[in-house]
Amino acid sequence: MAGGSKPRHGSLQYWPRKRAEKAIPSVNWSVVKGDGKTDSFLGYITYKVGMGTALVKDLTDKSMTQGKKIYMPVTILEAPSMKIYSVRFYKNNKVLKDVVVSNDKELRRVILAPKQPKSLDAEVPKEFDDLRIIVFSIPSQTSVKKTPDLIELAIEAKDKLAFVKSLVGKEITLKDFLKYSLLDLRGLTKGKGLVGPVKRMGIGLKAHKTEKGVRRPGTLGPWHPAHTSFRVAMAGQLGMFSRVTYNNKVIGSGTISEKNINPAGGFKQYGNIRSSYIIMKGSVQGPQKRQILLTPSFRPTKLTAKKKYELVEMQL
């Protein structure tokens, strides 16, 4: 029987293939927009709980299963509250001023917070083009860890400064953000460590009488040019890469106090959900307890936008 053949799947879109430097990827906020109708911030920090099966009612118009109950795989993300750490003022795409407005004790685990936070009213510069906020999660509300995660978020509002002033010192919840049915999920993939070129780049195995190894590339390149191209399939790091999954459908959300979805004994390798949660259709990159940043979808498709589902029951 002949062996199967396929092209190598080592995409050159992502390079260099090395471990990500940050747990939460940076975002190009110039392309992320909200609905344009309400004042909102454009990101939220969550933690991956795990996967399950959801029984949903398909409400999609002209769907083959319209009005019927169907099963689909879902991913559950826990979303504890967040707070504003500082307000950044920009001018000509450069940071003009960074005003720290919080010194919560949770921050002492990751940064050197000031003993006394500054007043935002007294520190507003005379001229600025844009402002963003640096928020930190409160993972002590979860069973994951105690160290908060910080990320810079953009804001969409008619009066951004007034909107930020209304949020300073208050806890931001998932309900304040969740106004979208499609979300982009940013996070790191599951780390695999050092792996060979067959698993990493998808090259084929050599014949059984081949010298110098079967799971190796046939050549590293010609004699001249006398250097090895970065396109050559070689062993190296696999996983722990920064990736974005686009147009993920929101199936449902809530809080544990309203509806408890914890299975008996808790979720495997995670524990029990203690705060708010969001249920997404399909799979999400990364292992359990990995940080996932939610942002509004910046290039939604008509097909995914028109799909509607009503959560009936979770089966975990």
Predicted regions: what is each one?
Residues 1-189, 194-316:
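Extended basic (Lys/Arg/His-rich) segments that typically form rRNA-contacting surfaces
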